[in-house]
Design a protein with these regions (language model features):
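Catalytic histidine site
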Residues: 114-175, 291-304, 308-316
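Extended, non-catalytic subsegments within catalytic or DNA/protein-binding/adaptor domains
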Residues: 152-154, 159-180, 189-193, 231-233, ...
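Active-site substrate-binding loop(s) of clan PA
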Residues: 185-189, 196-260
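A structural micro-motif recognizing beta-strand termini
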Residues: 135-137, 155-156, 198-206, 277-285
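Viral RNA-dependent RNA polymerase
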Residues: 6-11, 15-38, 43, 49-94, ...
Length: 941
C-alpha cells in the first residue's frame, strides 16, 4: 500500500548486529540445525528501524509514525499491527494464529475443574490479572507477578538501571500506572539466563502461587514438540495470544573429554539437558517477558503444568520464530523470600460477582472486580443523625455543618454522589521513596522502637484474650459498639446495634482467667476486678480460626471492606466543596485476626507513649503533655507543626510493609490458643518467626490492596491504609516517622555541606507523631536546609501534600515551639506553676459543642445539650480565666433565651481538678492548691 513497512528492512548480517547479540545453534522444524543469530526482540527491531531510517533519510521517530499510520488502516487479520505486537512479513505471519483480547474491566468468575487445577483458559485468565507491562530505559515488555510480591522480568530490560531508578508498571484493566523503585539487592537472576525475579514489590497486589503452574525440572523429558502459545500484555494494555508449535532445545554437557574410552570400556558420561524453547510463532518488539504455555502434547492430551518459560528473543534471520528461556517451579521458589498465595482469595472474590459491570463511582485508580448480587450490596446512610441544638448560633456562629451524604442534598450543586470525590482519596499515585534510603531509615525506626518498647514479654494469647484483652496496661478489649462489617451486619437482630450480638457475655469474678491447667500457662494474674467478658459465638470463632489457619499456611483469606461516608460535622468550606470524608469498615473477623497477630506490640506501643517518637494514647491533661514540650525545647525552640493531605489514601505501600515487618520481628513468635467449650480441649496455632512475618506480610497486603465494596461494585485499591483497620493509628504513626527521616536523608544528601549520617536525625531533631500529625523541634545547625518549606517541597515531588497543622499551607519558614499546634491543641504554661502545661483546644471546637447534637434515642436532647455545655466549659478552663468567663457569659445568655438552666462559675474548681491531672496526682475541687504545691513540685522533679 506504499510507504515503509517492516518488510522493507534488509536482512541483517552478523556484522550488522550489536555486540551483545550472540550466535547459537538452534534446531529447525525438520530437526536439522542452523546457525542463527538471535537478540532481544526490542533491540532487534530498534536496530532494523535505525538502518531503515538511514536508508530513507528520515529520523527513527518519523519512521515509527509512518509505519503506525500505515498499519492502523490495515486489516488486523492479515496485515501488520505494531502496537499489538504482530510483526514480520504478512506471509509468514499467517503461519501462526494470533488472537488479540481486549478484555473487559473485570474477567468472569473463574471456575475450577474437578481435579482442583484450573484449565488452560481459566489459568490464563487468572494470570492476566497479574500480567503487567513494564517500562524501562530499554523499552516496554510484559512481566508476570507471582508468589506474592515478586515480578518475573527480563534481565536485558533492567541491565541499564541504577539503584533508585524509577520503573513504570502498567497494571491490567487499564488501571492508572504505578511507579516502583529499582534496587539491585532485590534482583535474583535465574542461573545464566535472561530471566530474573524482582522481589518484594509492595506496590503490587500479592499474586497467586503461579510457580505451581510452571513445569518441574523432573518432567522436562516429557516435552519435545507440541502445540503451545505465547501469552503477552501488549502496549495497548490488552492481552494477546500467539498460537503455534513449540519445540524443546536440548544441549549436551560432557563430563570430561568427549569420546574418550576409559579402561573399563565405558565412555565418558554425558548429560543431555533442556535449555530453552523455540517456536515458529512470529513475535515483535515488546513481546519479551511473555509467558510460553503448552496446550497439548503430540497425543492431544493436555499438560498438567503448562507454563514453560519466558520469551526473551526473536530471530534476526529471514525465518520467523522466537526463543524462550526455561523457567521451572524450582527456579521461582528458590529465588523468592516469601512463598505466599492469594489465588483462593481472588477466585472467591470473583465468584461473588454476577457481572463485570463497572460502577461510575469507581475511577481508574481502582481495579474493578465486578458487580455483586443486589442482596450482597452495601448501602450508605442518606440521612444525618446530627441536628441543630436549641442554642444553635446563640453562643457563636457555626463554622461547621453536617457532611453531605447524598447527591440530592440541596447543598450539593453538582448533584454528584459525594462518594465519587471521597473515593479519589485512594486513587492518587505517589512516587516511591528511594530504596537505598528506605532500608537504613527502617533499621533506624526498628532500633528506636526496640529501645523504647523493650523486649516482648508475652508470646501467647487465647482467642478470648484477643477479644477481651488481659490484665496488663494497654491490652484494651474489642470495641463492641461499632458495626460488625460486611455480611455480619445482615445477621444482626432487629433493634440491636454494634457487634455484641455475635458474642456471649457474662460477669466474671475478680481473678478470672481465660486459661486452665490443660491449656496455656497464665502469664499474668487474672482480671483485677469484675467486668463483662465476651466469648465469640461458634460461627464467628470458627471463621476467625479458619482465617488464622489460612495465614499460617501462607495464604491470604478474603476480607471484604465497605466504604461508608462519615456522618460528621465538616468545616463550611469543605461543605461548599462537597468534600465528605470516607470510612472503610472492616469485617469483625478481620479485626480480630489483626488483633491476634499484633496485640502484644500495640499494647506496648500505647503503654510507652511519650518515650520514643509516638504520642499515640496520650492524655493531654497529664504530665506527658508537658514532657513533649520539654523534650522539644531541649533540642530547639523552633521548628514546625505538620500534617498531610489525604494521608491514609497516599500512605506509601513499601513503608506499610516495612512497618508490619518491624512488628513481626519485635514479636518474634506467637502461639494462639482456642478452647472447645463443649469438650474442654485446647488447640493451638504456633507462628514461628518465619510464619509470623509471612502472616503479617499478608496482612500488609490486605491493608494496601484491600477488596472494597461500594454499593454493588467490588474493587481493589492499590495503595493507602484503610481507615477502619484496627492498626491504622499505629501504622500511620510509624510511617509518619519514616517520612520525616526519609526527607532528612534526601535533604542532607542534597546539601553536601551537611555530611551527616541518617542516624544523626535524632541528634538534631526532636519529633512527636500521632497518626498523620507531627511536631518537630529542629536544631538551628540544620534549620537552613531542613525546614518546613524544604520538607514540603521534597514531599511534593513524590505526590505527597505536607502542610501546617491548621491545613493552611506552609507560609512561614519556621514556628516557635510555643506556637505549635498538635492534636488541635497548644501548650500554655500555667500562670502560677510555670512548669505545668495546659492543653487549650481550638476555640472553634469548644463553640461547636453548643451548636450541634447527635440524635440518641436513649438520651433526652436537653440533657445531652447540657452535658455538651459542661464539657465545653471544662475545655475553656485550659485557656485562661478571662476566656472562661466570657464563654460562660455567652453560654448562660443562650441558655436563658431557651429557658434552660444556667451554669454557675466553677472556674476555680475546674482549674484545681485539672491541675491535679496535669501534675499527675488526684486533686479534688475542695483541696486547696497551696496545700498540694509540694506534691506538685515533687511530681515535676
Amino acid at each position: 500500500k506504499g510507504g515503509i513497512g517492516w518488510k522493507d528492512f534488509k536482512p541483517l548480517t552478523l556484522e550488522d548486529v550489536p555486540a551483545e547479540v550472540e550466535a547459537m545453534t538452534l534446531p529447525t522444524k525438520d530437526g536439522r540445525t542452523r546457525n542463527t543469530t538471535f537478540m532481544s526482540s526490542g533491540d532487534y527491531l530498534a536496530h532494523r528501524a535505525k538502518i531503515a531510517a538511514e536508508q530513507q533519510g528520515i529520523t527513527e521517530e518519523e519512521l515509527y509514525q509512518r509505519v503506525f499510520d500505515q498499519v492502523s488502516q490495515q486489516d488486523p487479520e492479515t496485515d501488520l499491527d505494531y502496537e499489538s505486537g504482530v510483526s514480520g512479513d504478512p506471509r509468514t505471519a499467517r503461519a501462526s494464529k494470533t488472537v488479540v483480547h481486549s478484555r473487559p474491566a473485570a474477567p468472569r468468575p473463574l471456575p475450577q475443574t474437578q481435579s482442583g487445577d484450573l484449565n488452560l483458559k481459566d489459568q490464563t485468565a487468572l494470570m492476566a490479572r497479574h500480567l503487567y507491562r513494564i517500562r524501562t530505559r530499554r523499552g516496554e515488555c510484559s512481566a508476570l507477578a507471582t508468589n506474592g510480591h515478586n515480578l518475573i522480568v527480563n534481565v536485558h530490560m533492567i541491565t541499564d538501571l541504577k539503584d533508585d531508578d524509577p520503573v513504570m508498571l502498567l497494571p491490567p484493566n487499564h488501571v492508572t500506572p504505578i511507579t516502583i523503585s529499582f534496587h539491585r539487592r532485590d534482583i535474583v537472576i535465574i542461573g545464566n539466563s535472561d530471566i530474573a525475579i524482582w522481589k518484594n514489590i509492595a506496590r503490587l497486589p500479592a499474586a497467586p502461587r503461579f510457580s505451581k503452574y510452571f513445569v518441574r525440572a523432573s518432567d522436562l523429558s516429557h516435552f519435545t514438540t507440541f502445540n503451545g502459545m505465547i501469552y503477552s500484555r501488549g502496549a495497548d494494555g490488552n492481552v494477546h495470544e500467539y498460537h503455534g508449535t513449540i519445540q524443546a532445545i536440548r544441549e549436551t554437557k560432557w563430563y570430561g573429554t568427549p569420546y574418550v574410552i576409559r579402561k573399563d570400556g565405558e565412555t565418558i558420561k554425558k548429560e543431555i539437558f533442556l535449555s530453552g524453547w523455540t517456536s515458529d510463532i512470529s513475535t515483535s518488539h515488546g513481546t519479551c517477558g511473555s509467558i510460553w504455555l503448552a496446550k497439548e502434547n503430540a497425543y492431544g492430551k493436555p499438560f498438567q503444568r503448562r507454563a514453560l518459560g519466558i520469551h526473551i528473543a526473536g530471530f534476526t534471520s529471514q525465518y520467523s520464530g522466537a526463543f524462550a528461556a526455561l523457567l521451572t517451579e524450582e527456579d521461582i521458589e528458590g529465588a523468592i523470600d516469601w512463598d505466599i498465595d492469594t489465588s483462593a482469595a481472588e477466585l472467591e472474590a470473583q465468584s461473588m460477582c454476577i457481572s463485570t459491570r463497572e460502577h461510575t463511582l469507581v475511577g481508574p485508580g481502582y481495579d474493578t472486580i465486578g458487580a455483586v448480587a443486589p442482596k450482597d450490596a452495601s448501602f450508605n446512610p442518606s440521612k444525618t443523625n446530627i441536628i441543630r441544638s436549641k442554642t444553635y448560633g446563640l453562643v457563636a456562629p457555626p463554622v461547621t455543618a453536617p457532611a453531605i451524604l447524598t447527591p440530592l442534598d440541596p447543598r450539593n450543586p453538582t448533584q454528584q454522589h459525594p462518594l465519587r470525590k471521597a473515593l479519589t482519596k485512594y486513587e492518587s499515585r505517589t512516587v516511591p521513596f528511594p530504596a537505598s534510603a528506605r532500608k537504613p531509615v527502617t533499621q533506624l525506626i526498628e532500633y528506636k522502637l526496640s529501645k523504647t518498647l523493650g523486649p516482648c514479654q508475652y508470646y501467647d494469647l487465647t482467642l478470648d484474650e484477643v477479644v477481651n484483652g488481659i490484665a496488663v496496661p494497654g491490652y484494651a478489649g474489642l470495641e463492641m459498639e461499632s458495626s460488625p462489617g460486611y455480611r455480619w451486619k445482615k445477621l444482626r437482630p432487629s433493634g440491636e446495634e454494634g457487634k455484641a450480638f455475635l458474642f456471649n457475655d457474662r460477669i466474671a469474678d475478680a481473678g478470672f482467667t481465660f486459661r486452665d491447667e490443660n491449656g496455656p500457662q497464665d502469664p499474668v494474674p487474672g482480671w483485677p476486678e469484675c467486668k463483662k467478658l465476651w466469648t465469640m459465638k461458634p460461627e464467628l470463632e470458627q471463621r476467625v480460626w479458619e482465617d488464622l489457619s489460612t495465614l499460617h499456611r501462607g495464604e491470604r483469606p478474603l476480607f471484604i471492606w465497605e466504604h461508608q461516608l462519615k456522618d460528621e460535622r465538616r468545616p463550611l468550606k469543605k461543605i461548599k466543596d462537597v468534600n465528605t470524608r470516607i470510612f472503610t469498615m472492616a469485617q469483625v473477623n478481620a479485626t480480630i485476626v489483626s488483633r491476634a497477630l499484633s496485640l502484644h506490640f500495640v499494647a506496648k506501643f500505647y503503654e510507652t507513649v511519650g518515650q520514643g517518637f509516638s504520642a499515640v494514647g496520650i492524655d493531654t491533661s497529664s504530665p506527658i503533655w508537658a514532657k513533649l514540650r520539654r523534650d522539644m525545647l531541649n533540642v530547639s525552640d523552633r521548628g514546625c507543626d505538620g500534617d498531610f493531605g489525604k494521608f491514609d489514601g497516599t500512605l506509601d505501600p513499601d513503608l506499610i510493609m516495612d512497618s508490619l515487618r518491624i512488628i513481626a520481628r519485635w514479636q518474634d513468635h506467637l502461639t494462639l490458643w482456642r478452647k472447645d467449650h463443649e469438650t474442654g480441649q485446647w488447640t493451638s496455632l504456633v507462628f514461628g518467626p518465619k510464619e509470623l512475618e509471612r502472616a503479617l506480610i499478608l496482612m500488609a497486603n490486605e491493608f494496601i490492596h484491600t477488596y472494597q465494596l461500594v454499593f454493588d461494585c467490588l474493587h481493589r485499591k492499590w495503595q493507602g491504609n484503610p481507615s477502619g483497620n484496627c492498626l491504622t493509628v499505629v501504622i500511620n504513626t510509624i510511617v509518619n516517622a519514616m517520612y520525616l527521616r526519609l526527607a532528612f536523608a534526601y535533604l542532607r544528601w542534597k546539601n553536601p555541606i551537611a555530611l551527616l549520617p541518617i542516624a544523626a536525625y535524632d541528634r538534631y531533631v526532636k519529633d512527636w507523631f500521632y497518626g498523620d500529625d507531627n511536631v518537630l523541634a529542629i536544631s538551628p545547625d540544620i534549620l537552613d536546609w531542613f525546614n518546613p518549606l524544604a520538607i514540603s517541597e521534597y514531599f511534593a515531588t513524590l505526590g505527597l501534600e505536607y502542610t501546617t497543622a491548621d491545613k493552611s499551607g506552609i507560609k512561614q519558614q519556621v514556628k516557635k515551639v510555643k506556637d505549635f499546634r498538635f492534636l488541635k491543641r497548644q501548650w500554655r504554661p500555667d500562670t502560677e506553676f510555670r512548669h505545668l502545661m495546659w492543653d487549650p483546644i481550638d476555640p472553634d471546637t469548644i463553640n461547636e459543642l453548643t451548636n450541634w447534637i447527635r440524635i440518641n434515642p436513649d438520651i433526652d436532647p436537653d440533657l445531652q445539650l447540657r452535658e455538651q455545655f459542661s464539657n465545653a466549659l471544662r475545655e475553656a478552663v485550659a485557656h485562661d480565666r478571662r476566656f472562661y468567663r466570657e464563654f460562660l457569659r455567652k453560654c448562660n445568655d443562650a441558655l436563658k433565651q431557651c429557658n434552660l438552666d444556667q451554669f454557675p462559675d466553677e472556674f476555680d474548681g475546674f482549674r484545681t481538678s485539672r491541675i491535679g491531672r496535669l501534675a499527675g496526682v488526684s486533686v479534688t475541687a475542695e483541696t486547696k492548691l497551696a496545700e498540694n504545691s509540694a506534691t506538685v513540685i515533687s511530681v515535676r522533679i
